[in-house]
From Swiss-Prot:
Keywords: Ribonucleoprotein, Ribosomal protein, RNA-binding, rRNA-binding
A biological-process GO annotation: translation
Function: Binds as a heterodimer with protein bS6 to the central domain of the 16S rRNA, where it helps stabilize the platform of the 30S subunit.
Subunit structure: Part of the 30S ribosomal subunit. Forms a tight heterodimer with protein bS6.
Molecular-function GO terms, alphabetical: small ribosomal subunit rRNA binding; structural constituent of ribosome
Record-given protein name: Small ribosomal subunit protein bS18
Species assigned in the record: Hyphomonas neptunium (strain ATCC 15444)
Length: 85
């Protein structure tokens, strides 16, 4: 006959999906957002020169605003181009 299934013996399943990325600008060893650090800013600019959205880079809202401001400031000082051809 059928055996009774004990719910306590069934292992818990992990939820399906990807893990949330960690914001690189938070934590103890986080780097500062600086408009003069062109190499760091280039990682958050697409191939066409647009600012990459936070849903892709996993930067939180507060740091995304700082990052966008730093990129715009670097563009005004001609450290990085406005658009890439």
């Amino acid at each position: 006959m059928a055996q009774k299934i004990n719910i306590t013996n069934i292992p818990a399943r992990r939820p399906f999906g990807r893990r949330r990325k960690v914001d690189p600008f938070t934590g103890q060893h986080a780097q500062e957002i600086d408009y003069k650090d062109v190499k760091m800013l280039q990682r958050y600019i697409s191939e066409k020169g647009k600012i990459v959205p936070s849903r892709i880079t996993a930067v939180n809202l507060k740091n995304q605003r700082k990052l966008a401001q730093a990129i715009k400031r670097a563009r005004m000082l001609a450290l990085i181009p406005f658009e890439v051809k």
